[in-house]
Amino acid sequence: AESYCITGDGKVEKGIRDDAEHGDLVGHEDVYLPSGRGEETYEPFWFRTFRFIRLEVETGADPLRLLPPSYLETGYPLEATTRVESSASWVNGVWDISLRTLKRCMHETYEDCPYYEQLQYTMDTRSQILFSYMVSGDTRLAEKAMRDYRCSLMPNGLLMSRYPAREPQVIPMFNLYFIFMVEDYYRQTGKTEHILKSWLDRGFRLLAFCGLG
């Protein structure tokens, strides 16, 4: 789970997120039944982001030996080449949290949240791309994000607000962030190949829909 919650009367409310004394963990859960045929390892099929883990073990007549749980870190291999250091310790802490938050939101796509939706929303993604530009010269995931959004084009000229996604969703204002992304990319790299080949036409269609083209 990502937080301890106050539960009762069918409601779940977040208070102090690490208050284990008064709260309860509410979140994703798995049920695993050992076969009893020797040492076994369990891993979920999709990555899980967490702050807290709770294990509940029920045994039968046979003994069960439980080894200490471990985790594997996964994500986009962002190599940070920028570093922020300050004599004020809180600045260093904020920098560490900010960089780890960015990395947790980078896998095959950018994600608005690594625990809940895990979806690539245009407005969130633009902010994450700008942060990526500041800490690394790697533009590959940014380029992929713009290719992804290009593939979400609908007949009326709008892009989906999040993509790839199983269910379509359109937030008209979010389309402008795609145009901002393209401008940011040009200012960062000076490259025009992807813009002219893949993204410029989408930008013109969006502007036309907004009555600006």
Q: What kind of region is each of these model predictions?
A:
Residues 1-112, 124, 140-145, 158-164, ...:
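Extracellular/oxidizing-compartment recognition motifs
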Residues 3-25, 137-213:
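Helix-terminus loop motifs that line ligand-binding clefts
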Residues 43, 118, 185:
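Short, flexible active-site loop motifs that bind/organize anionic cofactors or intermediates
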Residues 48, 116-126, 137, 169-177:
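Aromatic- and histidine-enriched alpha-helix N-cap/loop-to-helix transition segments
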Residues 95-99, 111-114, 126, 172, ...:
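Noncatalytic linker/hinge segments flanking ATPase motor cores
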Residues 129-130:
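Helix-boundary and N-terminal cytosolic regulatory elements
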